[in-house]
């Protein structure tokens, strides 16, 4: 199945929604210009379209295989990964001092979308490696950074995240994996980890596992978790690998989707591990990687939605079926001319471009939080932390919806595997689950991002949206409609926020029963806000004589989102505030 990277759409979002002038002005990115980002993404888009997208169907059909303890990916994956490494794509948004290209994180997020649109199974390997790089960059010792970062940033070595155990899923207080100190300063790691993405494979030269485990005298619960680097192959000071560590993949999961991404059950048998940071601080360190991975999984949602939309749009243009309801033609017409097919396609486009807008905006905040001037970092960090669970939770839930609509547009053919669109739906279904379910994101949003600061960041978020409404109200007819719907959605958000702040202390069960509706309401509002900003940018570009067809489509997409999606905020508000006794007391 063909894939065309939407670089023009992505670059429009980066230029107008990522606070690019502020990002570009950061000392870290002083030599980076918008054209550099465009050139990199255009080249990467070509690479992914030509080399990686053709693997998607093969990977789904054949899947990863476990052969005598060795995981083998389908034919073509190793060749594509070698070229991915040789061309430096893993290094795109990582620091130049460790061999990276040094582009902003928001550009890296765009690349994450492109590679995961091409093939989500392939894209998961660099995604987890990026998370390992982020974690070690912040928490690793100088020696660990010097030894591991350049190899991970090139992609020669890949990274994983080992949290989950059979008895410890979302509840990491139940982790039992042990880490026993050794005389040489290393630790002997023992235990079983499950659901480890790319835990074993044949793409990279080595695999660097980041493992949560307990030392013998560790406190109970999550306070007793420590983080360890546990490489598949032990390496000398020069990085040459020789001896295999005492760990291995004992089985692979048989999955609904992303079948070429090996999901491993890993067994550690006194494997040599190296402590990262301090003992009993592992969960705090791992949250760095988890935040990176959660944001990236939200971007995967945009990626699979884009792929499903491209496929559905192409099919709707070609499929001839039925005369138009208005009698404008006597013969059957392409189904794209039928009103409900248009409704579905335009909803797909609005949700996809809206998710991209939200993800790109969040990427800009992440860049400013990490590299901005000291006085501006606190607000940028607060906004980034507020938005990440929205990107993860909202964008992935919408991705499943978009993929489902793609199947629906294909009719009966969509239910046939050979058409290919069923794969998008199957691949998308994991997104609201792994790296923290939607409920986990909603609990994080409500508990850590709203209740912890008494709603201060949430209210600042609403203030920024109100300012955008003011600008939209001065624009054209579509912009004014968007402003009205944004104001209505913001009012629903404010009422829901006040209700949760008032309820949480008295009746936490009732408050948290509304946490997912609150996440979806906030996600709708945040996305509508960013699309409103997109419409304003498009109006400004039109006034300068820009491409009318492209820019008017941006305005129309924002308008459609406002009229078809933002109106759902009132229903989400009702779900938050009208949580009846039945929801909490009905027998199950």
UniProtKB/Swiss-Prot annotation:
> Active-site positions, per UniProt?
435
Tell me the InterPro entries matching this sequence.
Acyl-CoA_dh-like_C_dom (IPR025878), Acyl-CoA_Oxase/DH_mid-dom (IPR006091), Acyl-CoA_Oxase/DH_mid-dom_sf (IPR046373), AcylCo_DH-like_C (IPR036250), AcylCo_DH/oxidase_C (IPR009075), AcylCoA_DH/ox_N (IPR013786), AcylCoA_DH/ox_N_sf (IPR037069), AcylCoA_DH/oxidase_NM_dom_sf (IPR009100)
Keywords for the protein's UniProt record, in alphabetical order: FAD, Flavoprotein, Oxidoreductase
What cofactor does this chain's UniProt record say it requires? FAD
Enzyme kind, highest EC tier: oxidoreductase
UniProt xrefs under Pfam families? Acyl-CoA_dh_1 (PF00441), Acyl-CoA_dh_C (PF12806), Acyl-CoA_dh_M (PF02770), Acyl-CoA_dh_N (PF02771)
Q: What is its EC number?
A: 1.3.99.41
Q: What happens when the gene is disrupted?
A: Cells lacking this gene do not grow on methylmercaptopropionate (MMPA) as the sole source of carbon.
Reactions it catalyzes: 3-(methylsulfanyl)propanoyl-CoA + oxidized [electron-transfer flavoprotein] + H(+) = 3-(methylsulfanyl)acryloyl-CoA + reduced [electron-transfer flavoprotein]
Q: Does the keyword Oxidoreductase apply?
A: yes
The molecular function terms of the Gene Ontology recorded here are: flavin adenine dinucleotide binding; oxidoreductase activity, acting on the CH-CH group of donors, with a flavin as acceptor
Q: Which family does it belong to?
A: Belongs to the acyl-CoA dehydrogenase family.
Q: State the function annotated in the UniProt record.
A: Involved in the assimilation of dimethylsulphoniopropionate (DMSP), an important compound in the fixation of carbon in marine phytoplankton, by mediating the conversion of 3-(methylthio)propanoyl-CoA (MMPA-CoA) to 3-(methylthio)acryloyl-CoA (MTA-CoA).
Q: What protein name is recorded for this chain?
A: 3-methylmercaptopropionyl-CoA dehydrogenase
Q: Which organism is it from?
A: Ruegeria pomeroyi (strain ATCC 700808 / DSM 15171 / DSS-3) (Silicibacter pomeroyi)
Encoding gene (name): dmdC
